[in-house]
Swiss-Prot record:
Belongs to the sodium channel auxiliary subunit SCN2B (TC 8.A.17) family. InterPro entries: Ig-like_dom, Ig-like_dom_sf, Ig-like_fold, Ig_sub, Ig_V-set, Myelin_P0-rel. A voltage-gated sodium (Nav) channel consists of an ion-conducting pore-forming alpha subunit functional on its own that is regulated by one or more beta subunits. The beta subunit SCN2B is disulfide-linked to the pore-forming alpha subunit. Interacts with SCN1A; regulatory subunit of SCN1A/Nav1.1. Interacts with SCN2A; regulatory subunit of SCN2A/Nav1.2. Interacts with SCN3A; regulatory subunit of SCN3A/Nav1.3. Interacts with SCN5A; regulatory subunit of SCN5A/Nav1.5. Interacts with SCN8A; regulatory subunit of SCN8A/Nav1.6. Interacts with SCN9A; regulatory subunit of SCN9A/Nav1.7. GO terms for biological process: cardiac conduction; cardiac muscle cell action potential involved in contraction; membrane depolarization during cardiac muscle cell action potential; sodium ion transport. Residues 30-157 are extracellular. This is Sodium channel regulatory subunit beta-2. It comes from Canis lupus familiaris (Dog). Residues 187-215 are annotated as: Disordered. It is found in: Cell membrane; Cell projection, Axon.
Length: 215
């Protein structure tokens, strides 16, 4: 029999929720840190990390924790582990003895370990935390994906070759442009020099030779 999660149904929209938390004074709300997606190899052990920041130290008499599982976003939640003065493993038939608590609430760590992950374990794992007198409940959501085999390693050789080729091509283009620019500049300077010489020679011919004029 599935156990319902400790999760009161929200009575307001996501927009209202965002507005509500935006009005909470900085440092007064609980922050929960989890990976959005966790890829795990079939048959391996997976640590579902969940840590939190609170304004208050953890009092085990007041602190409470719930871990739940969902097959999909719209599916009902099944609670499989909780903390009430101590860790209580509910040992769902789905997980049996494969779930272990691996965190330490006093260190703001409430992570769990899932042994021998199976394809049926794929889904959403929710971490709910209450740490009175903090009035705000923390919530983290992890999407667990089970892989049938290890993903192939990315070969960076092709990327390096392409990058080097592009870089070399650009270097050659820049070099050619610089050479062309230098050649043009030299030609312009030579033309200016030739024009100046021609102008000076023209002036000399126009003035003539003073001795010839006397004769």
């Amino acid at each position: 029999m599935h156990r319902d999660a400790w999760l009161p149904r929200p009575a307001f929209s996501l927009t209202g929720l965002s507005l509500f938390f935006s009005l909470v004074p900085p440092g007064r709300s609980m922050e929960v840190t989890v990976p959005a997606t966790l890829n795990v190899l079939n048959g391996s052990d997976a640590r579902l990390p969940c840590t939190f920041n609170s304004c208050y130290t953890v009092n085990h008499k007041q602190f409470s924790l719930n871990w739940t599982y969902q097959e999909c976003n719209n599916c009902s939640e099944e609670m499989f582990l909780q903390f009430r003065m101590k860790i209580i493993n509910l040992k769902l038939e789905r997980f049996q003895d494969r779930v272990e608590f691996s965190g330490n609430p006093s260190k703001y760590d409430v992570s769990v370990m899932l042994r021998n992950v199976q394809p049926e374990d794929e889904g959403i794992y929710n971490c709910y935390i209450m740490n009175p007198p903090d009035r705000h409940r923390g919530h983290g959501k992890i999407h667990l994906q089970v892989l049938x085999e290890e993903p192939p390693e990315r070969d960076s050789t092709v990327a390096v070759i392409v990058g080097a080729s592009v870089g070399g091509f650009l270097a050659v283009v820049i070099l050619v442009l610089m050479v062309v620019k230098c050649v043009r500049r030299k030609k312009e300077q030579k033309l200016s020099t030739d024009d100046l010489k021609t102008e000076e020679e023209g002036k000399t011919d126009g003035e003539g030779n003073p001795d010839d004029g006397a004769k």
